[in-house]
Amino acid sequence: MRVLGLMSGTSADGVDAVLVELSGSADHPRWSLLRSASLDYPTSTRQLILAVGQGEAKTASSLLNLSETITKIQAAAALQCDPEEQAQLVGCHGQTLWHRPPKRAGTGELQRGASWQMLQAPLLAQLLNRPVIFDFRAADLALGGQGAPLVPKADAALLGRTKGWRALLNLGGIANLTLIPPDAGPDRLQPVRGWDCGPANSLIDLAMEQFSEGEESCDQGGRLAETGHCDEALILRWLAEPYFQLNPPKSTGREVFGRADLTRRLRDMQGQPIANQIATLTAFSAAVVAQDLQQLSNQNHPLPIELVVAGGGSKNLTLMRELNTRCRGLRLRRSDELQLPSQSREAMVFALLAWWHHLGYPGNAPAITGAQHEVVLGVRVNPA
């Protein structure tokens, strides 16, 4: 079956689209990436998405208009990727505006989580004249799960296994980690694991936007960070914060590591040159991942033999060097080396999740999200 996958992440820079051929069994799919495309959000759209994600109050009218704009851009990306309309099914993540993980009240009662991925799915189905699977997080959240990350189980299916534990790190706005068991030995029966480590590009991008007065949306290639010096004492202090001490399952987003969080950290670095501040934020993103991997070792969990990196952050050479330095003993590779294109990977995940929905195959993993049990993810809407 040919499936379109559409993904717009927490960086809110645009939509990635893929056309994938999927066949075989659900747990060991055969796949082929046929085409890919990316479409940037207009600056005004991105700024509005980020503003809502930081908790700024907006009118119902502006949110309604935003949802229609996002949907039309998703459709345009899909048609750019699949102009001949080969796909039989579309998997669309939508644009995350807010993610609230579950938590326990003082009484011990569980408050279920909630997550808002903005999309007018019936409109998208009409514009593309194909069934759309969307709202992938809701079923896991309803079962007490985090609703995130959803990519690890799909990562394991797409990437496959090797002789040792393999780690796949996605560097989007947030850094999330997938641990894939080996293909042989006693650990082959272990479940896939995954969680959100903390900020990857979110704080760096917001800082660049602030320092450049809107002229720059990111540190291209990590060039500015490369010229600065990071504050290791400050990084150690930040690593002691509560979120980084939590054990999985755990998930987070820009509502935690967004503009308010950046303001606090910039206050900690007050008086330092801008290059040093960007260098410190970049090193911090790498240190968060390294600390999580070290905590695995402290819990007697086998360390992965390689760290496969995907997402926009893999283009930040300074961030990649920091990861290489701080994650000692791991072979660092880009997912492109394994025929899993970094830019397209998450869109491929949502194509696979849509296919799994079509097959009636569960897309979540309770060991990762904390849900009560496995469940088929997503809601299907057909063109009228």
From Swiss-Prot:
GO terms under biological process: 1,6-anhydro-N-acetyl-beta-muramic acid catabolic process; amino sugar metabolic process; peptidoglycan turnover
Keywords of the record: ATP-binding, Carbohydrate metabolism, Kinase, Nucleotide-binding, Transferase
Pathway linked to the protein: Amino-sugar metabolism; 1,6-anhydro-N-acetylmuramate degradation; Cell wall biogenesis; peptidoglycan recycling
Catalytic activity: 1,6-anhydro-N-acetyl-beta-muramate + ATP + H2O = N-acetyl-D-muramate 6-phosphate + ADP + H(+)
Keyword Ribonucleoprotein: no
Enzyme class: transferase
Domain of life: Bacteria
Residues that bind ATP: 9-16
Molecular function terms, GO-annotated: ATP binding; kinase activity; phosphotransferase activity, alcohol group as acceptor
InterPro entries xrefs: Anhydro_N_Ac-Mur_kinase, ATPase_NBD
EC number: 2.7.1.170
Record bears the keyword S-adenosyl-L-methionine: no
Protein family per UniProt: Belongs to the anhydro-N-acetylmuramic acid kinase family.
Entry function: Catalyzes the specific phosphorylation of 1,6-anhydro-N-acetylmuramic acid (anhMurNAc) with the simultaneous cleavage of the 1,6-anhydro ring, generating MurNAc-6-P. Is required for the utilization of anhMurNAc either imported from the medium or derived from its own cell wall murein, and thus plays a role in cell wall recycling.
HAMAP family listed in its UniProt record: AnhMurNAc_kinase
Protein name: Anhydro-N-acetylmuramic acid kinase
The organism of origin for this protein: Synechococcus sp. (strain CC9311)
Gene: anmK
